[in-house]
UniProtKB/Swiss-Prot annotation:
Transmembrane regions: 34-54, 78-99, 114-134, 179-199, 227-247, 289-309, 321-341, 348-368
KW Heme (keyword) present: yes
Keyword Transmembrane carried by entry: yes
Domain of life: Eukaryota
General remark: Heme 1 (or BL or b562) is low-potential and absorbs at about 562 nm, and heme 2 (or BH or b566) is high-potential and absorbs at about 566 nm.
Name this protein carries in UniProt: Cytochrome b
Binding-site residues, heme b b566: H98, H197
Localization annotation: Mitochondrion inner membrane
Gene giving rise to this polypeptide: MT-CYB
Lineage: Eukaryota, Metazoa, Chordata, Craniata, Vertebrata
Binding positions (heme b b562): H84, H183
Database matches in PANTHER family: CYTOCHROME B
A Pfam family annotated for this UniProt entry: Cytochrome_B
Keywords on record: Electron transport, Heme, Iron, Membrane, Metal-binding, Mitochondrion, Mitochondrion inner membrane, Respiratory chain, Transmembrane, Transmembrane helix, Transport, Ubiquinone
Amino acid sequence: MALNLRKNHPLLKTINDALIDLPTPSNISAWWNFGSLLGICLITQIVTGLLLATHYTADTSLAFNSVAHMCRDVQFGWLIRNLHANGASFFFICIYFHIGRGFYYGSYLNKETWNIGVVLLLTLMATAFVGYVLPWGQMSFWGATVITNLFSAIPYIGQTLVEWAWGGFSVDNPTLTRFFALHFLLPFVIVGLTLVHLTFLHETGSNNPLGIPADCDKIPFHPYYSTKDILGFALMLILLVSLALFSPNLLGDPENFTPANPLATPPHIKPEWYFLFAYAILRSIPNKLGGVLALAASVLVLFLAPLLHKSKQRSLTFRPISQVLFWALVANLLILTWVGSQPVEHPFIIIGQLASLSYFTIILVLFPIAAVLENKMLKL
């Protein structure tokens, strides 16, 4: 009998088990497409980022001009930059949908996969933050100043830590060069973590919309889901290219077209849209250390999801009370995102505080209560 290389070769066997013969539940919906879309986002960002890095100069006197030079004088440099900048937005759209899917369908009960996923989110946020500093515009500079300054709230070691991160007494050339080094390194850390994420996922297999074991009815990944994934790729790339070609600056801040000036503070310092929910939570607490802790908690609370699961059912498919809470949480996050983009004045302050309070209340208090209530309803 002829040797089947795909199933016997040490390297091809790994690829085969992950992408071709992988047993997959037959009923997973389009919400399960976002994992592979994140893979495409990562590849796109690494390729465009590498091309940008070949023309970029990480020096305070040259960074802004090197980006302008790229957009004007490099073949398709404008397109590569627009794809990279907007690709970051799509990366976050996909990861938020991916996390939302995991939360809705109880995928967090695959604890290792979920925890690695949260670490991936934190790494992605760090990568996006240091990347935003590189063009050295006004919002790059002041964003870096404000966010790195938050570490000074840490008791005793805070100020030392911040000056160590800056490489001086303010955000300056050493900060820019190390941020460029980190921005180059972290995507490869993300690639490594992604492989670990997939390894843990394939230990248990994918969850499905019903939240029940599906071993009795699984189908091979290829050709069924490989085809479905390609449709997802096409749709996302069409949207990304459309945004990059028709409205590349839609999601950016006009302030970043002005070179960084340490002597002039922009009227409203705010991060990119994908950090606004966390920024709103940070601002809603009128104490520096308290705000920093709330900011950290807003993302780290995801680690608690498996511990807060009190329901006898895995997914929210048949849990109407928890469904209402889930969509209230989504609406709450949209409100936080909007408030984060507004100036710190009435009525935005109180709206932000109420939204921040309800964010933590829904996740930490109401979800477990609803689950216990639904368990009791099952006995009626």
